[in-house]
Structures are given as structure tokens and as C-alpha cells.
């Protein structure tokens, strides 16, 4: 309520001083008769509408501050018009000039001189107009005021600063009246601050006593309850601790008893073992004495017999090793012949050497042993036989890698006959049309058969010579002729050349194995 009252007072002060803030301004009014034309009539109506709008805005601004603020901010020249209206309204001379009586006399042509009022003539100048200055309200720093009271005082001081910044000049009586009311307002605020602090202090003391009393009662109740709870808690903990300690020490006792039992059993077992060892040593001593006595008699030649038996065993081992190695060499020779017969066969199916090479590896480990794992000498190298066997396993040792037979190589070469005819008719750098034309005319060519001249380089002669070499199982010469081919013909024979080289490599490795086997 106090804050509302102070805010209302500040609003009244602000409104009152705003109305007295302008100076008196005089002027003459010149009446001009408009010409009776349509343009002047429209101009007159427009001026009348603008005048009515501004007059209505000024009238509304005197009764509603929000609309007045909106009018002065949004309409051009509205702020000056409102200030002039306030000045003329509260000035006695101007008010009399704008009175109804003055206007009637003006229209009748009578003397309309405005005489200043007697009161205005009797009042001195320094009493009639005085600059208003209000002192700010300050509370004593030693008194701790409430935050709400401090906010009210700050709001009032901001309003007073706004009034002082306007430097309002008003009559002396009104100034003194305003100052007296302001002093009374300050006294009321200070008295209200004092009463508010006393009321707050008294309320705080009463609330504090009530809270302390309640806290003490709650503390006594909680203390009694906590005492009972603590007694029960410690009693239960003591019983639980007692049971745990009994269990713990009972377990320790059982463990110690078990350990002592095991210790006694181990000690007893050790004593029995020691006794048995002693008895065995005594028995061994007796046996040794008996053997020594017998050795010096009937068993005097037993050591010589033992050495001869060891020599015989070593001789038998060596003979067995030689026989085993010779048998393994024979088996290796047979296995090499089996592989060679498969390679030279005219079977239509591919040749798989996985099982044969596995058996050959087993026989090689027996007949041609490699370096011992314990030997770390750097100069030791595997034999040529084992190197060739390793290379042969890398080429054809897997179960999926198969070697083409002689018949398959020959048949696949014959499949390239039509492509060779086409290639023999191709011009250099032939395009699609050249390939098509060569393919067409190759249908009219005959294939050359039989032996061809060794020096002939035309494709027909080369094809016939390779065909003849394959027919006589001369794969190495056929491969040599294919290698000499160039260009498109070499591309056509690429897959066939890979398979033929692979078969030829296997044959050469088999020949190496056969040669090395003869030197073993």
C-alpha cells in the first residue's frame, strides 16, 4: 500500500511540474477569408480535419498518459503542440484571452485588451517564479532498512532526479506548498521505515522463539528415540560381532587342527620313507657285495660280453639303415617312373600329382635326410634333390592344381586353328572391319599339315610345325616356336603357353630328380 501511495504521489508531482514547465509565448491571429473555389474548399476541409485530429490527440493526451505517449511519439509535431497547450492552459493571461467572453467581445468589435490580474501585479517577480529543486531522500547508513523500502526510496529518488533535471520554474506559493508536502512525505517515509523495522524485528524475535521452542521439543523427542535406537543397534551389533568372532576363531582352530594333523601325517610318512630308504640302501649294499663277489668269480667276462653286444647292435642298426635307404631309393625311382608315365600318357583327363608327390616326399625324408634341426651351421645347404622336390611341390603339389596331358595339349592347340587362319589374314593395326574381313576369308583357307620347313616364318608353316612337334611329343620345340610368335597370335596362344610351360617345367623337374637319384 505504501509503495502504491508513493508511486501515485510521484506521478502527481511529475504531472504537475510538467504542466508548469513551459514559458509564456504570445502571438497574433490573422483571419484570412478563403476563396470560394473548389480547391480552397478542399484545402479548408483538409486543414479542418488535420486541426480536429491534432486537437483530439491533445485532448486525449490530457486524460490518458498511455495514449498521450503514443500520440507524441508517433505524430509529427505532437509533442510541441501538447507542451504549448499546457503552457497556454495554465497561464492566466492566455487563459483569459482564450475565454468565451474575450472571443465574443473580439467578434463584436469591442476593446479586448487583456489586463493582468491584480494578484499577478501584486506578487513580486522573485515570488511569482522560482526554480524548483528537491533534495534526494537518503537513509542513515547505520540503519539497516528493508530491501523493499530501499527499492521504494530508489524509485522516489529517480523521480526526483527527473523533476530536478527539468529545472521547473513555478510560483513561490506553489513551490513552498510542494516543498512542505515533500518534507511531510519524507517524514512519513522515515516513520514508516522505523515502524517497518520495529515490526519486522518483533516478528523475527517471535518467530525465532517459536522455532527455537519447536526445535528443542523435536530435539528432545529425537534424542529419546535415537537413544533407544542406538541401544538396540549396538546390542544387535555386539551380538552379531560375538557370533562372527566365535565363528572366525572356530574356523582358525579347525584350520590349525587340520594343519597339525597333516603335519603329523607328513612327518610319519617321511619317517616311514626314510626307514624304507635306509632299508633299500642296506639291501643295495648287500646286493652290491654279492654281485662283486660273483663278478670276480663266474661273471668276470660279463663286461666284454656287454661291449660286444653293443657293437653288434650298432652294426645291425647301420645295416638296417642301409637296407631301408636302398629300399626307399628303389621306391623313389619307381615313383618317378609313375609320375613320368602319367605325364607322357595320352589320357583325356587332367593329371593330378598330389598323392604321388606326397608319397615321394615321405620316401625322400627316409632316403635323403635333410639337415638336423639342432644343427645351426650357416654353410649347410639342402641337397639338389630336395630343392627340386620342393619346387615340384610348389608347381603341382596342391590337390587343385592339375597338369594337362599330352592329348589335352594337342587338342587345345588344334582349337586355335581357326584363330590362326584369321590372324594370318590380318593387316597391321587391324580394326573391327579388318578382323571381320579376316574371319570371313579364313573360311576359304586350307590348313597346312605335315612337316614344314624349319626356317619358314609364315603363320601356316609355324602352326603346322608346332602341330607336328606336339604329335611327336616334342613339347619343348613346340613351346620354343610359340614363344617366337608376336602380336595378336601371341595373345591367342597365351593361355595354351602357360599350361604347356607348366607341364614342361614339371617334366624337367622330374628329369632332375631322376638324375640326382642315380647319384645317391
From Swiss-Prot:
Record-annotated membrane-spanning stretches: 43-60
Main localization category: mitochondrion
Membrane topology field: Single-pass membrane protein
Membrane topology (Mitochondrial intermembrane): 61-520
GO cellular-component term (any): mitochondrial crista
Mitochondrial matrix side: 21-42
Domain of life: Eukaryota
Coiled coil feature spans: 176-325
Organelle targeting sequence: 1-20
Compartments reported by the entry: Mitochondrion inner membrane
UniProt keywords, alphabetically: Coiled coil, Membrane, Mitochondrion, Mitochondrion inner membrane, Transit peptide, Transmembrane, Transmembrane helix
Magnesium listed as a keyword: no
GO terms under biological process: cristae formation; protein import into mitochondrial intermembrane space
Family stated for the protein in its record: Belongs to the MICOS complex subunit Mic60 family.
The protein's assembly and partners: Component of the mitochondrial contact site and cristae organizing system (MICOS) complex.
Task performed by this protein: Component of the MICOS complex, a large protein complex of the mitochondrial inner membrane that plays crucial roles in the maintenance of crista junctions, inner membrane architecture, and formation of contact sites to the outer membrane. Plays a role in keeping cristae membranes connected to the inner boundary membrane. Also promotes protein import via the mitochondrial intermembrane space assembly (MIA) pathway.
Protein name (record): MICOS complex subunit MIC60
Species this protein is from: Candida glabrata (strain ATCC 2001 / BCRC 20586 / JCM 3761 / NBRC 0622 / NRRL Y-65 / CBS 138)
Amino acid at each position: 500500500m505504501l509503495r502504491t501511495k508513493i508511486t501515485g504521489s510521484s506521478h502527481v508531482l511529475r504531472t504537475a511540474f510538467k504542466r508548469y514547465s513551459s514559458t509564456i509565448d504570445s502571438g497574433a491571429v490573422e483571419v484570412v477569408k478563403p476563396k470560394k473555389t473548389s480547391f480552397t474548399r478542399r484545402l479548408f476541409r483538409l486543414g479542418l480535419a488535420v486541426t480536429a485530429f491534432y486537437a483530439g490527440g491533445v485532448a486525449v493526451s490530457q486524460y490518458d498518459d498511455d495514449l498521450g505517449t503514443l500520440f507524441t511519439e508517433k505524430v509529427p509535431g505532437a509533442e510541441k503542440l501538447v507542451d504549448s497547450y499546457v503552457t497556454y492552459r495554465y497561464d492566466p493571461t492566455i487563459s483569459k484571452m482564450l475565454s468565451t467572453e474575450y472571443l465574443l467581445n473580439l467578434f463584436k468589435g469591442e476593446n479586448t485588451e487583456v489586463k493582468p490580474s491584480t494578484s499577478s501585479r501584486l506578487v513580486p517577480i522573485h515570488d511569482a517564479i522560482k526554480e524548483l529543486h528537491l533534495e534526494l531522500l537518503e537513509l542513515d547508513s547505520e540503519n539497516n532498512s528493508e530491501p523493499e523500502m530501499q527499492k521504494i526510496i530508489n524509485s522516489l529518488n529517480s523521480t526526483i532526479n527527473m523533476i530536478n533535471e527539468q529545472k521547473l520554474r513555478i510560483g513561490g506559493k506553489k513551490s513552498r506548498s510542494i516543498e512542505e508536502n515533500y518534507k511531510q512525505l519524507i517524514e512519513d517515509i522515515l516513520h514508516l521505515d522505523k515502524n517497518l523495522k520495529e515490526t519486522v524485528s518483533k516478528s523475527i524475535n517471535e518467530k525465532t522463539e517459536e522455532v527455537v521452542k519447536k526445535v528443542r521439543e523435536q530435539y528432545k523427542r529425537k534424542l529419546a528415540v535415537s537413544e533407544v535406537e542406538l541401544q538396540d543397534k549396538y546390542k544387535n551389533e555386539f551380538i552379531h560381532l560375538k557370533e562372527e568372532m566365535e565363528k572366525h576363531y572356530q574356523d582358525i582352530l579347525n584350520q590349525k587342527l587340520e594343519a597339525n594333523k597333516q603335519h603329523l601325517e607328513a612327518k610319519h610318512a617321511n619317517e616311514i620313507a626314510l626307514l624304507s630308504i635306509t632299508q633299500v640302501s642296506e639291501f643295495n649294499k648287500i646286493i652290491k657285495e654279492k654281485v662283486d663277489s660273483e663278478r670276480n668269480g663266474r661273471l668276470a667276462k660279463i663286461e666284454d660280453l656287454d661291449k660286444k653286444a653293443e657293437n653288434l647292435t650298432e652294426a645291425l642298426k647301420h645295416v638296417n639303415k642301409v637296407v631301408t635307404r636302398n629300399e626307399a631309393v628303389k621306391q623313389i625311382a619307381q615313383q618317378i617312373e609313375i609320375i613320368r608315365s602319367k605325364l607322357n600318357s595320352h589320357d583325356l583327363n587332367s593329371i593330378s600329382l598330389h598323392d604321388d608327390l606326397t608319397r615321394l616326399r615321405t620316401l625322400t625324408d627316409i632316403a635323403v635326410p635333410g639337415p638336423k634341426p639342432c644343427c645351426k651351421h650357416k654353410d649347410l645347404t639342402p641337397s639338389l634333390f630336395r630343392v627340386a622336390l620342393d619346387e615340384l611341390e610348389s608347381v603341382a603339389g596342391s590337390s587343385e592344381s592339375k597338369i594337362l596331358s599330352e592329348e589335352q595339349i594337342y587338342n587345345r592347340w588344334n582349337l586355335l586353328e581357326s584363330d590362326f587362319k584369321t590372324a594370318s589374314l590380318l593387316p597391321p593395326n587391324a580394326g573391327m572391319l579388318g578382323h571381320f574381313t579376316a574371319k570371313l576369308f579364313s573360311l576359304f583357307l586350307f590348313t597346312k599339315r605335315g612337316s614344314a620347313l624349319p626356317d619358314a616364318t609364315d603363320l601356316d608353316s609355324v602352326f603346322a610345325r608346332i602341330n607336328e612337334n606336339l604329335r611327336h611329343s616334342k613339347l619343348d620345340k613346340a613351346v620354343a616356336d610359340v614363344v617366337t610368335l608376336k602380336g595378336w597370335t601371341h595373345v591367342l596362344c597365351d593361355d595354351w603357353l602357360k599350361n604347356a610351360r607348366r607341364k614342361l617345367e614339371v617334366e624337367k623337374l622330374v628329369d632332375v630328380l631322376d638324375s640326382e637319384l642315380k647319384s645317391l
